[in-house]
């Protein structure tokens, strides 16, 4: 028997609310009569908008307060962008479902100019170090400008910050109806996506069987295998979502292909690798590829990145 009511915890950004409302709509269609409500929660990542996330430091910048609400019993489930979800959870909580992935690529928003045709010294707005590293590897002449804010705010910074282009996740642009602004979708071999990019995760209390059964139908096995492999790689590298680590898994039949990438922020030093194997062994594959990358130079790269960020964090009052 389905639950009579369900409370969904979500951030209050435009994209987060779209995602939570999509989950709400799917639940209401599947369980007519169920009362589904949204509980908006402000996270530390929403409060600190004038500092790059990498400098704020820590993990779970967009989920911690939501998880605290769940532990208090204020919400039943939480809907997250998978790329924001840390690889470790508070005791008693966990990721129960990973939804089918939307377009995982990065998108270029410009004045109609494709990435390769952007002028020498072009100013590029981005919120992610892994994008910055990969794009500088290809175009070291470019100037990367860290931008924050919701999707629409970042799009508008093309004009307000006098940028030549802004790079955003295609999934958010498609969900919010901004695809007409896209000049080009970057292939995943040029800009490997963030871990989990394009997928949603639904978190709940692990001991609540009724809630788990209610949301089971959201899980998309192929996406879940791919994202679990990506997250295992990130976990083994001890990385948060604000370090220049990228990974992208693709499932074909019962096989999984995983590409991983670690780089210095300026893109001058990087290591990349690929592994294939049974999708059912997704987490083992992610860990194995991570160990290969770390051994091939990734460990030294990350040690330098973390040292730099630790020194910056000390300067920031939170």
Curated annotation (Swiss-Prot):
Keywords: Porphyrin biosynthesis, Transferase. It catalyses: 4 porphobilinogen + H2O = hydroxymethylbilane + 4 NH4(+). Its cofactor is dipyrromethane. GO terms for molecular function: hydroxymethylbilane synthase activity. It is an enzyme of class 2 (transferase). Its EC number is 2.5.1.61. One of its GO terms (biological process) is protoporphyrinogen IX biosynthetic process. Binds 1 dipyrromethane group covalently. The keyword Ligase does not apply. The porphobilinogen subunits are added to the dipyrromethane group. This is Porphobilinogen deaminase. The gene is hemC.
């Amino acid at each position: 028997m389905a639950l009579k009511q369900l409370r969904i915890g979500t951030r209050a950004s435009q994209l987060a609310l779209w995602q939570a409302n999509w989950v709400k709509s799917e639940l209401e269609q599947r369980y007519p009569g169920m009362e589904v409500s949204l509980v908006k929660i402000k996270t530390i990542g929403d409060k600190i908008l004038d500092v790059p996330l990498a400098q704020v430091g820590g993990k779970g910048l967009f989920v911690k307060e939501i998880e605290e609400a769940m532990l208090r019993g204020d919400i039943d489930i939480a809907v997250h962008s998978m790329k924001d979800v840390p690889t470790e959870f508070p005791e008693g909580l966990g990721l129960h479902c990973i939804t089918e992935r939307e377009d995982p690529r990065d998108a270029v928003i410009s004045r109609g100019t494709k990435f390769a045709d952007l002028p020498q010294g072009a100013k590029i707005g981005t919120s992610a170090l892994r994008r910055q590293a990969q794009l500088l590897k290809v175009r070291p002449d470019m100037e990367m400008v860290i931008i924050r804010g919701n999707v629409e705010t970042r799009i508008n910074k093309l004009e307000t910050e006098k940028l030549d282009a802004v790079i955003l996740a295609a999934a958010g642009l498609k969900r919010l109806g901004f695809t007409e602004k896209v000049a080009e979708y970057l292939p995943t071999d040029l800009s490997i996506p963030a871990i989990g990019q394009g997928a949603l995760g639904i978190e709940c209390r692990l001991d609540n069987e009724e809630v788990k059964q209610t949301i089971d139908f959201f899980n998309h096995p192929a996406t879940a295998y791919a994202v679990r492999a990506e997250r295992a790689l990130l976990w083994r590298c001890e990385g948060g979502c604000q370090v220049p680590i990228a990974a992208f898994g693709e499932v074909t039949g019962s096989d999984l292909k995983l590409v991983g990438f670690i780089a210095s922020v300026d893109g001058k030093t990087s290591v990349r690798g690929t592994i294939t194997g049974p999708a059912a062994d997704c987490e083992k594959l992610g860990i194995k590829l991570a160990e290969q990358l770390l051994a091939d130079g990734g460990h030294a790269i990350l040690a330098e990145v973390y040292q730099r960020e630790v020194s910056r964090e000390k300067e920031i009052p939170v």
